[in-house]
UniProtKB/Swiss-Prot annotation:
It comes from Platanus occidentalis (Sycamore). This is ATP synthase subunit a, chloroplastic. One of its GO terms (cellular component) is plasma membrane. It is a multi-pass membrane protein. Pfam families: ATP-synt_A. Signal peptide: none annotated. The chain crosses the membrane at residues 38-58, 95-115, 134-154, 199-219, 220-240. It is found in: Plastid, Chloroplast thylakoid membrane. F-type ATPases have 2 components, CF(1) - the catalytic core - and CF(0) - the membrane proton channel. CF(1) has five subunits: alpha(3), beta(3), gamma(1), delta(1), epsilon(1). CF(0) has four main subunits: a, b, b' and c. Keywords: ATP synthesis, CF(0), Chloroplast, Hydrogen ion transport, Ion transport, Membrane, Plastid, Thylakoid, Transmembrane, Transmembrane helix, Transport. Key component of the proton channel; it plays a direct role in the translocation of protons across the membrane. GO terms for molecular function: proton-transporting ATP synthase activity, rotational mechanism. The lineage of its organism: Eukaryota, Viridiplantae, Streptophyta, Embryophyta, Tracheophyta. Belongs to the ATPase A chain family.
Length: 247
């Protein structure tokens, strides 16, 4: 089996998939490039919410923590425990990465249900959660792939590549393919679940009175949180796996 062309085709497929579009979209023309304005606008809003909330909560730490300080300390402790469980004792340097992934995805997912995006009128299309777009989920999955390769190479050097012939060299093609399919599974799982949730709510709102879809919206909030947790857990698990060198 020729592994290199297979790997190249997988990467090319991932690049092509990042151009998948659902519905109409609004673009900015910058030079010779078209920039996906909808995703950028909603992503900036999510980033502003995260930065603003963190700044307000911790700008003046108290000996007796305020409610906001308590909340952020709880979130940090949760992310540290998650990272330590999946990565091991060397989890420390990876807490910011895992935390950033979890918080951005969590707030992005919830923004699709809680923020009134539709009051902002665009020439084409409409605003929605950033994770409702395959371009965002691919952009989140690719740094995760780079992170676990970096973690493995930093910890084990070139010996990291020895894992591809474990437990037998016959599995070399499968082990290589597995690493290149991880970002595919991460991006499609997140994109598919968030898109499906928003579509279900839209359909129900259009078919039945506004009160009926409320339970579905609450279920969507729960599912959105679970999807953020799954993504962060898998990202940490992949990093821990690359550092330990076992499957």
């Amino acid at each position: 089996m020729n592994v290199l062309p297979c790997s190249i085709n997988t990467l090319k497929g991932l690049y092509d998939i990042s151009g998948v579009e659902v519905g109409q979209h609004f673009y900015w023309q910058i030079g010779g490039f078209q920039v996906h304005a909808q995703v950028l606008i909603t992503s900036w809003v999510v980033i502003a919410i995260l930065l603003g909330s963190a700044t307000v909560a911790v700008r003046n730490p108290q000996t007796i923590p305020t409610d906001g300080q308590n909340f952020f300390e709880y979130v940090l402790e949760f992310i540290r425990d998650l990272s330590k469980t999946q990565i091991g004792e060397e989890y420390g340097p990876w807490v910011p990465f895992i935390g950033t992934m979890f918080l951005f995805i969590f707030v992005s997912n919830w923004s699709g249900a809680l923020l009134p995006w539709k009051i902002i009128q665009l020439p084409h299309g409409e605003l929605a959660a950033p994770t409702n777009d395959i371009n965002t989920t691919v952009a989140l999955a690719l740094p995760t792939s780079v992170a676990y390769f970096y973690a493995g190479l930093t910890k084990k050097g070139l010996g990291y590549f020895g894992k591809y012939i474990q437990p037998t060299p016959i599995l070399l093609p499968i082990n290589i393919l597995e690493d290149f399919t991880k970002p595919l599974s991460l991006s499609f799982r997140l994109f598919g679940n968030i898109l499906a949730d928003e579509l279900v709510v839209v359909v129900l709102v259009s078919l039945v009175p506004s009160v009926v879809p409320i339970p579905v919206m609450f279920l969507g909030l729960f599912t959105s949180g679970i999807q953020a947790l799954i993504f962060a857990t898998l990202a940490a698990a992949y990093i821990g796996e690359s550092m330990e060198g076992h499957h």
